[in-house]
Amino acid sequence: MGDNNQATTGFDPAANAPDAAAWDKGKGKATDPTQDMRMDDDESDESEAEEMIDDDDDEDNDTLEPISSDNIISGGRRTRGKTIDFQAAAESLKDDGMDEDDDEDDDYVGAGDDDEDNKMQD
């Protein structure tokens, strides 16, 4: 009875996968890229020098003119804060002869319609 004891190994998904060859394909665990730290230091020095050059350019382009008061819209053309009475607007449309059914296009015959009913209307 004691002869069949086997030690269990840890969880190995590659060994337990139904298609063990597919384990290497697709998304896998991310690995940390190894980089030389000396190269990173050089890059940071270069980027700091570029930032200082960019700051000098901003000061040269700071020649904006002030805003002219002629471009400011004044008067009653704005609708912010204005109360709109939608019932009165609907009543004025009815008074003008505009009904809700006027915009329906039941009698429209399109260019691609080849029904017999549409041919009779022509």
Curated annotation (Swiss-Prot):
Gene Ontology CC annotation, any one: nucleus
Bias kind Acidic residues: ranges: 39-63, 97-122
Major localization class: nucleus
Record flagged with keyword Chaperone: yes
SMART domains: CHZ (SM01082)
Subunit structure: Forms a heterotrimer with H2A.Z-H2B, stabilizing the association of the histone dimer. Also, with a lower affinity, forms a heterotrimer with H2A-H2B.
Name this protein carries in UniProt: Histone H2A.Z-specific chaperone chz1
Organism: Aspergillus niger (strain ATCC MYA-4892 / CBS 513.88 / FGSC A1513)
Gene: chz1
